[in-house]
C-alpha cells in the first residue's frame, strides 16, 4: 500500500493540492465535522426560551477545542496512524492537551457561574473523549452508538443546559436529532474511509457515501443557521 493509501488524505474535505504537511493538518482538523459538532451546541442553545449568545458562542468554542482539536489528535495516535507519521506521538499529545485544558476551563467557568448541570454533562463528554478515541476498555465504547450519543446527543444537551441549567422535552427532541444525524454520519464515514484508504476513489459506492456525508454535514449546519437567523431576526 502506497503512502497516500495508508492515510486518510484522499477523503473529501482534504485539499487535493498543496504541501503534504498542510493537507494533513487540514485533514486532521476534520473541519466539516468539527463545524457540524459545534452546530449541535448552537441548536441546543437556540431551543432555549431565552438565549444568551455569549454562552452559546463560548460553549461552541469548548466543543471546537475539545472535539475539533483534542479528540482528533488523540484519534490520530491510533495504531493504524490514520494521518501517518507527520506528527510524532508527543506532538499529538501536546496538541490534545493544549486544546483540552482551555476547553475544560471555559466549560467549568460556565458550570460554576451559570449552569451546574453542565458538570455531569462535561464529565460524560470527557469520559467519551478519552474512552472512544483511545479505545479504552478494549474498545467497548468505540462504536457507532456511543459516537452518536457523545458526538450528537450530548452537545445539543450541553447547548441547552448552558442557557437554562435544565433539560426539557424540546432539548431531548433536539438531542434525538443530534443522535440520529451523527449516527448517519458515522455509519457512512466508516465504509467511505475504508474505500478511500483502499484506493477506491472512483467507485460509485464511495461517491454515494461522499454525497451522504456532505449532505448530512450541510443539513446540520443549515439547521443551526436557520435557528440562529430566526433568533436574531425573528
Stretches found by the model and what they are:
Residues 1-26:
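Short, Lys/Arg-rich, polar N-terminal cytosolic tail immediately upstream
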Residues 23-28, 32-42, 55-65, 71-118, ...:
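Multi-pass membrane catalytic core of lipid/isoprenoid biosynthesis enzymes
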Residues 23-50, 134-167:
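Long, highly hydrophobic alpha-helical transmembrane signal-anchor segments
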Residues 39-61, 103-121, 155-174, 226-234:
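Helix-coil boundary and interhelical linker segments in multi-pass alpha-helical membrane proteins
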Residues 64-71, 124-134, 153-155, 175-186:
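Alpha-helical transmembrane segments and their membrane-interface exit regions
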Residues 70-85, 127-141, 186-194:
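C-terminal ends of transmembrane helices
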Residues 90-163:
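Intramembrane alpha-helical segments
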Residues 179-234:
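C-terminal transmembrane helix-loop-helix hairpin of multi-pass membrane proteins
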